[in-house]
Amino acid sequence: KEYRRQRQMCIRDSNMVDGIDGLLGGLSSVSFAATGIILWFDGQYSLAMWCFAMIAAILPYILLNLGALGRRYKVFMGDAGSTMIGFTIIWILLETTQGKTHPISPVTALWIIAIPLMDMVAIMYRRLRKGMSPFSPDRQHIHHLIMRAGFTSRQAFVLITLAAALLALVGVVAEYTRIVPEWVMLILFLLAFFLYGYCIKRAWKVARMVKRIRRRIRRHSGNNPN
């Protein structure tokens, strides 16, 4: 039952984060890449190749969706695509984090899916606090926050994907080196989670602050053309 709940949460997570062009593809590619790299160095070549094959399947969607080939195409992931990706990610992570000789520690899995997981939990908690359904739509996701701060949808895609890649890299390095104990990595993840939740809770204030910083940077650049 616990595995079933985890699987369902991750599937819904993938569906909820699919809010702007290419975002689900970018975030899922980061998760598959991080998982595949760890599995490859652990000698789990079959599962690693499965992860890399998923990236190869997702990449054309990202390129067409973002117009990277010179023209934008209306390519939609849809509920079927997003739920299939979420199911595949959670299946691989559950397969590789359980048992006595698991190649990936459970806390590393949290870092691998950090951004989608944080976004889903923070949003669902906020909705429940307001007496709303946790699955009711709103405009408080991370991409809404970034676009409210004055960024375009493509810039939001790049920023969120880079943030996800950075967090996943932390997990990969920690898993590969084994220098930092798992309990420390869990505390660090919870601190990152708290910071994310703080920003989401004060989304309007954060957006205004970012706008002010961007305006100051523009004014400074305009006054100093050289």
Kindly label every feature range from the protein language model.
Residues 16-24:
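RNA/tRNA-interacting regions in translation and RNA-turnover enzymes
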Residues 13-16, 145:
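Residue-level recognition of specific faces of alpha-helices
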